[in-house]
Amino acid sequence: MGLRETLCVSMLVAASPASAAEDFIKGVYLQTQELCAQAKKDTLQTLIDTGNVILSADGLQSVEYNCEFVQVTKATRSPSWAVTAICQEPGFLFPDILSITQMNATQIDIVSVRPTADEGEQAGNGGSYYLCEGVSLP
């Protein structure tokens, strides 16, 4: 392999978010523990169909809304990640930058730079999410 090919491969490996994401979000998270109980009782798809937002390592997902996590960078001094996301809803596609923090073994908090429409409204993609043990993505 020539110098040019070696350099290209090295750049791709260095840019890969795999090492930053190896301890990233594990499992499925919902916005309340009650929703987790409902997902176990019914199905996760039922909750998605009613408009609830699901958090996983892939991103945020709902019936007509999703944010794909395209770049994940691990913080060195806290259990946090800086995440670049591409979000879409019917008729709109937009970027977002998120800070995601593992608050404890079952809670993740997200802060979004996306502005809100009204004061007091939840900030963009931000909020708390709770681990739903025993629940898998459909």
Residues covered by each model-derived region:
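N-terminal helix-cap/turn-to-beta initiation motif at the start of protein domains
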Residues: 19-30, 55
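Short, hydrophobic/aromatic-rich segments at coil-to-beta transitions
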Residues: 26-28, 57-58, 76-85, 106-109
